[in-house]
Amino acid sequence: MDKQLADTFTQLSQQNGVVGYCCVDESGLCLKAHGNKQSSNAGFYKSLLDKSKFLTQSGEPANIVIETDTANIFIQQNDKITLSVSKLP
């Protein structure tokens, strides 16, 4: 899995507009982060996805987009890994 994560982070770093990313495990602990305040928000991202399960009929976590004046944050869960990506608006 480490190779797969490393490849994903390399691809993210090469995309235009990406200013940060954070990978979180199923306990809410930061596995890897890059960018401003990404690691300090790791538990928050995981908590948001856990709460989003109550908003869907299937009980699956929703994909979340947070839009601000300075960045758009995309949060998604795949298997047991939560990934957030911050991009310029």
From Swiss-Prot:
UniProt subcellular location: Cytoplasm; Lysosome
Listed GO CC annotations: lysosome; Ragulator complex
UniProt main location, coarse: cytoplasm
Keywords recorded for this protein, A-Z: Cytoplasm, Lysosome
Gene Ontology BP, a term: regulation of cell size
Function: Regulator of the TOR pathway, a signaling cascade that promotes cell growth in response to growth factors, energy levels, and amino acids. As part of the Ragulator complex, may activate the TOR signaling cascade in response to amino acids.
Protein name (Swiss-Prot/TrEMBL): Ragulator complex protein LAMTOR5 homolog
Organism: Dictyostelium discoideum
Higher taxonomy: Eukaryota, Amoebozoa, Evosea, Eumycetozoa, Dictyostelia
